[in-house]
Amino acid sequence: MYDLPDKRGHFGPYGGTFVAETLISALDELCKQYEYYRDDAEFQAEFFHELKHYVGRPSPIYHAKRWSEHLGGAQILLKREDLNHTGAHKVNNTVGQALLARRMGKGRIIAETGAGQHGVASATVAARYGMECVVYMGSEDVKRQATNVYRMKLLGATVIPVDSGSCTLKDALNEAMRDWVTNVSNTYYIIGTVAGPHPYPMMVRDFQAIIGNEARQQMREEYGRQPDALIACVGGGSNAIGLFYPYIDEENVRMIGVEAAGKGIDTHEHAATLVTGRPGVLHGNRTYLIQDENGQIIETHSISAGLDYPGVGPEHAWLKDCGRAEYVAVTDDEALAAFHALCRFEGIIPALESSHALAYAAKLAPTLNKDQLLLVNLSGRGDKDMATVAQQSGISL
């Protein structure tokens, strides 16, 4: 039986707690509180009640029949996380962490965001539970995701653009950490992915595991068996781990994480951390990183803001090393082609992040038999990406 992380938050040599001394007691307290509430029937009941009545779960599994026929080969099934309230998987985690923050007596939540989806999901739960919310966002992403910035402000959050470094997700994370160190007594930091110091990778995974737990039951009821492969995009990797985790002990189900190859992994313009990186320490944990020979973080690139991150969750690093999961990379152009295909064949506009998983499914399906099943995590909808996609087609909105 798979039972990681260990007590100190390690997945093999990855994970752990590499943070300033000032945060150790806050993380210890968070660990203690989370371990208590994880087994608390009342907390769990409230969490599942909110997922059902506020988020709109369970999200269905949809057979992309026309697209599957067009591609030939395996059947492509979509786990429709795009249908959640706020339009992506992120809200599964923010609901859980906000309920925890409330029980810990914290009235202020902070968050970092790349594509803006986690920022929106954090602002949403802050409004839902009457909390103050501050969101840190790289100034580059603020430009790319103007609609989501406005959504956060509508929901009552303060959005702080970050102008340091590459002005993207990693820099927003740095600023959020600084804020937390300064205001730890009244502030809860909602990390949006399975990265950061322990207990975050475990906690975010547990809240996102609703995806895979639902999928297992739905596959059993609707198809009488489990899929041959799971496919999900990986930036930090929370939507992927949410789908993968409940399947880890099922060795006959392949797990495939799809990273952003950007303009190609042979260029410096990509974010394929597991495919090209090597281990190091960033944002409080040891994991694979995109770094130069001196250990300096290299700036990443992806057409999708949510995959534009030089690290990855430590559990993914471990799943790669032990061979349980496979990791591949898909270029901007391949993701765009899959984005357009899903629009045309199925009437579903996917997020650019999710389009990376779709693109790999489109490559894999024709190599398999018609009776094989590929379950793709459609982690979010594409409304936020309209301007980016239009720009690629030479259209200004």
From Swiss-Prot:
Pathway noted in the entry: Amino-acid biosynthesis; L-tryptophan biosynthesis; L-tryptophan from chorismate: step 5/5
One GO cellular component, as annotated: cytoplasm
One annotated GO molecular function: tryptophan synthase activity
EC number(s) given by UniProt: 4.2.1.20
Catalytic activity reported: (1S,2R)-1-C-(indol-3-yl)glycerol 3-phosphate + L-serine = D-glyceraldehyde 3-phosphate + L-tryptophan + H2O
Pfam families: PALP
Cofactor: pyridoxal 5'-phosphate
Alphabetical list of InterPro entries matching this protein: Trp_synth_b_CS, Trp_synth_beta, Trp_synth_beta/beta-like, TrpB-like_PALP, TrpB-like_PALP_sf
Entry-linked Gene3D superfamilies: 3.40.50.1100
Modified residues (N6-(pyridoxal phosphate)lysine): 90
Alphabetized UniProt keyword annotations: Amino-acid biosynthesis, Aromatic amino acid biosynthesis, Lyase, Pyridoxal phosphate, Tryptophan biosynthesis
Domain of life: Bacteria
UniProt-listed PANTHER family: TRYPTOPHAN SYNTHASE, TRYPTOPHAN SYNTHASE-RELATED
Assembly and interaction partners: Tetramer of two alpha and two beta chains.
Similarity comment text for this entry: Belongs to the TrpB family.
The protein's role, per its UniProt record: The beta subunit is responsible for the synthesis of L-tryptophan from indole and L-serine.
NCBIfam families registered for this protein in UniProt: trpB
UniProt protein name: Tryptophan synthase beta chain
Natural source organism: Nitrosomonas europaea (strain ATCC 19718 / CIP 103999 / KCTC 2705 / NBRC 14298)
Taxonomy of the source species: Bacteria, Pseudomonadati, Pseudomonadota, Betaproteobacteria, Nitrosomonadales
